Amino acid sequence: MHITILNGPNLNLLGTRQPEVYGATTLADIEHMCQRKAQALGLEIEFNQTNHEGVLIDQIHAARSESDGLIINAGAYTHTSVALMDAVASVSLPTVEVHLSNIHARESFRHTSFLSPVALGLICGFGATGYVMALDGIWAHLTAADSARP
């Protein structure tokens, strides 16, 4: 099974950007954590980051033919992008939305997620561990779906 993990704007600055909110873990650290977890679960992952909404949409579209599931931390686009919501809905892949911080405990504009209505699940507030939790969750969903097939 193949999982695409997408990261949106400013996540390339993790480790130095507002460590009091996002922690000291870098995106490279998170990728390494995901690689270890994926290997333990027998998954292959593709890990990407971009600051550009259109590139995220292109990567979501590409996942349609390359992946069995999607994990996405869309950063601030979570709260603003109908286009990302439409892209996720259009590919019909099980999708887990991840956020390092608890978006519901922050500014009110962060309480709205355009992705949640089209996602299988949402994990927020657990820092970098949320990505590992997302891999566990999507693996459990996919293997349960496989075992339910005749």
Swiss-Prot record:
Keyword Lyase set for record: yes
Listed Gene3D superfamilies: Dehydroquinase, class II
Site (Transition state stabilizer): R17
GO BP terms: amino acid biosynthetic process; aromatic amino acid family biosynthetic process; chorismate biosynthetic process; quinate catabolic process
Catalytic center residues: Y22, H99
Enzyme kind, highest EC tier: lyase
Alphabetically ordered keywords of this record: Amino-acid biosynthesis, Aromatic amino acid biosynthesis, Lyase
Pathway stated in the Swiss-Prot or TrEMBL entry: Metabolic intermediate biosynthesis; chorismate biosynthesis; chorismate from D-erythrose 4-phosphate and phosphoenolpyruvate: step 3/7
Reactions mediated catalytically: 3-dehydroquinate = 3-dehydroshikimate + H2O
Residues holding substrate: N73, H79, D86, L100, S101, R110
EC number of the protein: 4.2.1.10
GO MF annotations in UniProt: 3-dehydroquinate dehydratase activity
NCBIfam families in the record: aroQ, PRK05395.1-2, PRK05395.1-3, PRK05395.1-4
Recorded family membership: Belongs to the type-II 3-dehydroquinase family.
Function per UniProt: Catalyzes a trans-dehydration via an enolate intermediate.
Record's subunit section: Homododecamer.
Protein name: 3-dehydroquinate dehydratase
